[in-house]
Amino acid sequence: MTTTTVARPRRTWWQFAGYLAKRATMMELRGYQSIYRFVFRRPRVPAGAAAFSYHQPLLAILIVIIVVSTIEMVVVDVIVSRWTYVRVPLLVLSIWGLVYMLGLLFGMLVRPHAVGPHGIRVRSGSEVDIPIDWGDVQSVTRRKKVISEKQPKVTVDADGQATLHLRIMNETNIEVQLERATPVRLPHGTETVSRVHLYADDPAAFHNEARRYT
């Protein structure tokens, strides 16, 4: 099956800069919120819904980065401790980077996919949260797909249907076929899609839970 890239209007330089600034700010704020939710054990799972994680392929990588960043911060602080004007900015920058990585990790932990009486919540960290009502779902199937790194998040197949790919390590393993083309909100804007491909750490459990409602 061939796919094509969805064309989007080009932004001006100022529009692109504004978009990046807004997105960075929102990621920062959501990162702090994720840390708060993790510390106080308040995951975002709708009442009555079952949670399904998707962080396992990335967990070891993120933990290594966080540990190395922590060690690096301490070592650099010791090396430049005699020069306050250098030490303080580097320490602030190091702490900010460490907090950012923690927010990224905790964003996945406290915002899992959810399957419940009212539908499916498809998540990708703190940036993507797509509610799909059961009335909009035609089918939920297990389907493993390995996706090229260069392939965009939204593609259009030969049959004219747009597919959203929320991959982890270039892989998805669940397909949600929608009853009709449905608008979904993404970080770069709204896209209209007919299918959603996502990754779950336990695709069998996700599929079995979805079968209870479809």
Whereabouts are the PLM-identified features?
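Transmembrane alpha-helices and immediately adjacent membrane-cytoplasm interface residues
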Residues: M73-V80, V88-R111
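Polybasic (Lys/Arg-rich)
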Residues: V193-R195, D201-T214
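Non-transmembrane, membrane-adjacent beta-strand/coil modules in membrane-associated proteins
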Residues: G125-R195
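Conserved beta-hairpin
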Residues: L98-K144
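N-terminal membrane-targeting/pre-transmembrane regions
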Residues: M1-R82, T190-R195
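Residues in well-ordered beta-strands of folded domains
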Residues: D77, Q177, Y199
